[in-house]
Amino acid sequence: INSQTEIGKIKYRSGGTMAASDWFKIKVKGKQTHGSQPWEGIDPVVVSAQIINGLQSIISRQTELTKNAAVITVSVINGGVRSNIIPEEVSLLGTIRTLDTGMQRTIHEKIKLTASKIAEASGATAETSIDKKTLVTYNNPELTKKMIPSFVKAAGADNVIEAEAVTGAEDFSFFAEKVPSIFFFIGGMEKGTDPKKAFPHHTPDFRIDESGMKTGIKAFCNLVFDYTK
């Protein structure tokens, strides 16, 4: 159920529907020194800032976004304990989202290369580790085509919408890897609400209208009955 889709509507997509999610950590190591004498050390804070900017150019300048969307987000920066000490080490944590396995592999390689070379240019080092969390949530095209009439019976033709791919991720992707599957969205947003003003998932003000689950129940029942015919 989706907080930014109106009650009574169903959204689906054939093929890659939700992104693969990977977490990364970059450990930037420099040389600690006093903040008044930066030339005596190697500043991992400045190097980390340069790496963050460099990672964004992987998406904006090195990735063919007309094929598929991709995201690199640095969301955590840890380093330093005092205002007048340049620390020895800074850690960057973030997430990578991709809708294509080839693009995923290339972006992983470029993150490692970008971080290490930027660090090297300043005399620092950057060690990158990437943890693959979920796969691309892939809807089997043949199954999806077969099940669209089931959605129409549940919600009406005007309320069944072919959606764009989503850069959020789902562990349902592991089921879809094993058997032909379909993952879809049912509306949980009150009618008349502007989707841009509806609070997204994973935020403090997230809210859904549970009456939207009626459409979901109808859809699931139709899917089961129609699939077994």
Predicted features by range, described:
Residues 29-31, 77-78, 97-99, 131, ...:
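Solvent-exposed residues in well-ordered beta-strands and their adjoining turns
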Residues 53-60, 129, 135-188:
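Active-site-adjacent substrate-binding region
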Residues 34, 48, 94, 147, ...:
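Divalent metal-coordination and catalytic microenvironments
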Residues 83-108:
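A conserved active-site cap/scaffold subdomain adjacent to cofactor or substrate pockets
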Residues 11-32, 37, 41-44, 102-155:
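Metal-dependent peptidase/peptidase-like ectodomains
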